[in-house]
């Protein structure tokens, strides 16, 4: 039987309960799962902190670091091609079968790699939170953060 190998990508700036839910969902279904963590120096959150936060909930999850990602985003053909060339370098020879996300771009990633697209809580009905909202008001959204993430964000202010 074919081994089910999934992955997700994200900035995790900061890591929150919606991310945790997505990873938990994937781990239930996959034999192996990778989390691609993008470095985002412009957001002033170190990639090492993001990895620490994720591994505090999932010590055995496989992490792939994504440094110096292309700055061109979007769902237009050119942007997708640029992002996918970069992402393919990150995942390398890993024979992925499933892509997990809560975002519109999930279909583009899955189609490009010719793998299954798994959409998790896209409408944010289970956890109505986005990292950008947390960045804008940590106190208002702290209930969506684990203690370590909240503490680190408070210390960095």
Regions found by a protein language model. Give the residues of each.
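Nucleotidyltransferase catalytic core that binds NTPs
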Residues: 1-157
């Amino acid at each position: 039987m074919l081994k089910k190998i999934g992955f997700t990508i994200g900035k995790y700036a900061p890591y929150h309960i919606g991310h945790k839910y997505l990873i938990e969902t994937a781990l239930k279904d996959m034999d192996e799962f990778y989390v691609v963590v993008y470095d985002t120096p412009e957001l002033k959150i170190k990639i090492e902190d993001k990895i620490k936060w994720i591994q505090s909930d999932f010590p055995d999850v496989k992490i792939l670091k994504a440094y110096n990602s292309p700055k061109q985003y979007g769902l237009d053909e050119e942007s997708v091609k640029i992002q996918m060339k970069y992402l393919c370098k990150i995942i390398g020879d890993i024979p992925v079968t499933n892509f997990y996300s809560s975002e519109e771009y999930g279909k583009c990633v899955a189609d490009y790699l010719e793998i299954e697209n798994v959409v998790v809580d896209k409408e944010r009905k289970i956890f109505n939170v986005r990292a950008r909202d947390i960045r804008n008001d940590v106190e208002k959204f702290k209930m969506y953060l684990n203690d370590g993430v909240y503490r680190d964000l408070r210390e960095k202010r």
